[in-house]
């Protein structure tokens, strides 16, 4: 009985295979000669009107198979078009799962490697930047220290040795010929105190600068003063500031001097009568607020008197030598 049952099962299975083959081949159209390259390795595929039976063997062994169909048209290269009559390809699901797992593992490993590489590169860049910053800071600190050391050394050298100070640059001296010197001597004898316009004219004539002319006249006056050669006329105001005691005494008694007295003072001070008169007028102007000038009928001269002090009683009139004026 068991043998009969086994035979019957084998017969039914063969009939099922043949029936499926006939139905499938009748409905199929022209197919490609080789499976497409973008699919994984199929366990079975259709070529022409032939069906390889490893597909049925897998069915008989109750292995879960994943199959898909791809409708291809000769005028269309799209493998996912469902409206086209086409070829049926069968794949093993275990292989697909393995391939997917392997691809996922490789993707994860690549992603992990990329992350680790980026992390290492970031660390290296950070370290290099940090080192470069430290080096630049160290260099700047060293430069500042060197500059401070150099400045301290220079200061010490200046304190310890005065020869470090650079010497002063001497001015270029004017080379004057003998003719120029003789002409300058003649100008000095005529006027030892030339004004600004005369100095410019002299400088233009002798092809010299105004400063050189000023220094030459100044040195000439100093040399004559040291040698006590005072033939030239000195400045009268300087001499008045030194010896004006006699003028003050006469002014206290007679603020308006007579002509004889003016000539006497001009000859004694080696100046002109006009400068003596100017001195008296300025002195009267300076005392205009504190003193009053009155006319003395007995003397016939103007005098000034103060409310607190009477100069006429304390300073008698000084007698002047008329012969000195005539001489």
Swiss-Prot record:
Biological process terms in GO annotation: regulation of transcription by RNA polymerase II
PROSITE patterns: HOMEOBOX_2 (PS50071)
Cross-referenced Gene3D superfamilies: Homeodomain-like
Biased composition (Basic residues): 168-178
DNA-binding region(s) from the entry: 169-228, 232-291
Protein task: Putative transcription factor.
Protein name: Homeobox protein 8
Organism annotation: Dictyostelium discoideum
């Amino acid at each position: 009985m068991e043998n009969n049952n086994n035979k019957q099962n084998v017969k039914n299975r063969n009939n099922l295979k043949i029936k499926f083959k006939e139905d499938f081949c009748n409905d199929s159209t022209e197919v490609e000669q080789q499976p497409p390259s973008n699919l994984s390795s199929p366990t079975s595929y259709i070529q022409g009107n032939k069906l390889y039976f490893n597909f049925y063997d897998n069915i008989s062994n109750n292995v879960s198979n994943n199959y898909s169909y791809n409708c291809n048209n000769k005028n269309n290269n799209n493998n996912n078009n469902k409206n086209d009559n086409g070829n049926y390809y069968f794949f093993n699901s275990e292989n697909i799962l393995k391939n997917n797992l392997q691809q996922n593992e490789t993707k994860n490993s690549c992603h992990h490697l990329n992350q680790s590489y980026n992390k290492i590169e970031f660390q290296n860049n950070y370290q290099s930047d940090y080192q470069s910053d430290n080096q630049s800071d160290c260099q700047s600190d060293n430069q500042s220290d060197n500059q401070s050391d150099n400045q301290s050394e220079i200061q010490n050298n200046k304190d310890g040795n005065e020869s470090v100070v650079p010497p002063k640059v001497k001015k270029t001296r004017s080379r004057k010929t003998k003719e120029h010197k003789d002409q300058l001597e003649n100008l000095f004898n005529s006027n030892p105190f030339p004004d600004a316009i005369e100095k410019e004219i002299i400088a233009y004539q002798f092809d010299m600068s105004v400063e050189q002319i000023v220094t030459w006249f100044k040195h000439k006056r100093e040399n004559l003063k040291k040698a006590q050669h005072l033939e030239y006329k000195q400045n009268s105001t300087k001499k008045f500031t030194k010896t004006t005691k006699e003028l003050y005494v006469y002014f206290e008694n007679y603020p308006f001097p007579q002509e004889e007295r003016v000539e006497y003072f001009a000859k004694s001070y080696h100046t002109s009568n006009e400068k003596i008169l100017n001195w008296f007028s300025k002195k009267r102007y300076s005392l205009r607020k504190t003193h009053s000038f009155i006319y003395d009928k007995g003397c016939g001269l103007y005098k000034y008197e103060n409310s607190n002090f009477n100069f006429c009683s304390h300073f008698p009139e000084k007698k002047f030598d008329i012969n000195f004026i005539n001489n």
